[in-house]
Design a protein with these regions (language model features):
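Cofactor-centric catalytic regions
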Residues: 53-113
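Proteins synthesized as precursors that undergo proteolytic processing into mature forms
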Residues: 1-76
Length: 113
């Protein structure tokens, strides 16, 4: 799989979430890119560390984080500050086809021919 994202401080978090969803949870690349993301830290001029979770995440996820003492804040989905990822996955035992994915948080599109 080749993939990347723009997004400054959020790049490692976005790349990790996409890779984990493909490798560990078996999502295709578009599903992995589309899924709600989390952003922790100080980003894009914030004055303090924040834990942002896109609002498309289940409410139970917000509740569980709050119960553990995390001051999580909802971020509108799609939230461009979460980075805009693109990916291509080569054929393998999981699929005989190439897979492409583009982030709905940006202006890309995945096309095949």
């Amino acid at each position: 799989m080749v993939y990347g994202t723009q997004g400054g401080e959020v790049q490692p978090q976005t790349q990790t979430s996409v890779a984990t969803r493909v490798v560990d949870f078996g999502l295709n690349v578009q599903e992995a890119i589309d899924a709600p993301r989390v952003l922790y830290g100080r980003s894009w001029g914030d004055t303090s560390n924040k834990l942002l979770l896109e609002s498309a995440a289940p409410e139970a996820t917000f509740d569980a984080l709050r119960e553990q003492g995390h001051p999580v804040e909802p971020a509108q989905w799609p939230f461009p500050r979460m980075g805009t990822a693109q990916a291509i996955r080569l054929p393998g035992p999981w699929s005989p086809f190439f897979e492409g994915g583009a982030d709905p948080r940006g202006e890309g599109i995945a096309l095949g021919f």
